Structure formats: C-alpha cells, structure tokens
UniProtKB/Swiss-Prot annotation:
Protein purpose: May play a role in chromosome segregation through establishment of sister chromatid cohesion. Unable to complement ae7 mutants, and thus probably not involved in the cytosolic iron-sulfur assembly (CIA) pathway.
Pfam families for the chain: FeS_assembly_P
Gene Ontology biological process: chromosome segregation; protein maturation
Family: Belongs to the MIP18 family.
Superkingdom of this protein's organism: Eukaryota
Key word Heme present: no
Name recorded for this polypeptide: Protein AE7-like 2
Keywords noted in UniProt: Chromosome partition
Length: 149
C-alpha cells in the first residue's frame, strides 16, 4: 500500500449508537450493517468505514426472501486510490459471515468516485475477485481491515 495519504484530513462523523437485538433468525439491514460497521479504513486504520461515512445504515439493502444483499459505499474522495480494497473487504466480510445462500453485491455509490464504473466492474467479476484473493499481501491487508480492536 502507498505510504502517501490521499486524504490527509478526513472528516470524522459521529457514530450511530450501536443497537442489539435478541432475534438473530433473519438477515436484514440491521444485522448486515453490524457485520461490516467496524471494518477499518485502509488509509486510516484507526478509523472505521462508519467513522468516515463510507458506510451508513442507508447504504445497506437486504432482501432475505430473495437471499440478496447490496452494499453501496461512498469513498471519502472522488479520486480515492483504494476503493477496490474497501469493496473487497466488505464483500469478503459479508461472504464469510452470511449464510451461503446469499448473493452479495458491493458497489461504489453513483457519482462518488472518478473510476466508479471500473471499480464496480472489478467488484462484480468473480474471477477477478478470486484472483485478487490469491494475493497474500492483499489478503493480509483485508484481514487487518477486518480486525476488531
């Protein structure tokens, strides 16, 4: 990863109060958001994607009956150089934590990144995702992003 920061002074948003529930039988926006809210930003590992407003509860769509989850994330800058890493991390975290029946779709929010189409194409290509996950350095970074302090 580059040692040069693209976003030296990111805006930090207040976290929403963490909510818990006792019924864990269904997968919905609430449970899916809780699965990914603590993913760390690759450029600022002391901050979560939620802290930077890259992920919000509103960016999570779930259809339990159709076994479908869509996450739309917003990079902090239109020229952010790590949106693919962020998207891959979200994808991996959800695939690892959701029941196997779910199809997971991760996308950059429309108009939020200069290379939105390219990033979305990469994240939607199973062969590219599989190839990326064979890179030990990238896997190490993704694991670091998913670590909960």
């Amino acid at each position: 990863m580059d040692s040069v920061l693209t976003n030296k002074n990111p805006i930090i948003y207040p976290k929403r109060t963490r909510r818990y529930r006792t019924d864990q039988s269904s997968t919905d926006e609430f449970s899916s958001t809780n699965r990914i809210r603590d993913i760390k930003d690759p450029e600022h590992p002391e901050l979560s994607l939620e802290d930077l407003n890259v992920l919000t509860e509103e960016s999570v769509e779930v259809d339990d009956h159709k076994s479908y989850v869509r996450i739309t994330f917003t990079p902090t800058l239109p020229h952010c150089h790590l949106p693919t890493h962020i998207g891959l991390c979200i994808l991996v975290k959800l695939v690892q934590s959701l029941p196997a029946r779910f199809k997971v779709d991760v996308r950059v929010a429309p108009g939020s990144h200069d290379k939105e189409t390219t990033v979305n194409k990469q994240l939607g290509d199973k062969e590219r995702v599989t190839a990326a996950l064979e890179n030990p350095e990238l896997v190490a970074l993704l694991n670091k992003m998913m670590q909960v302090c």
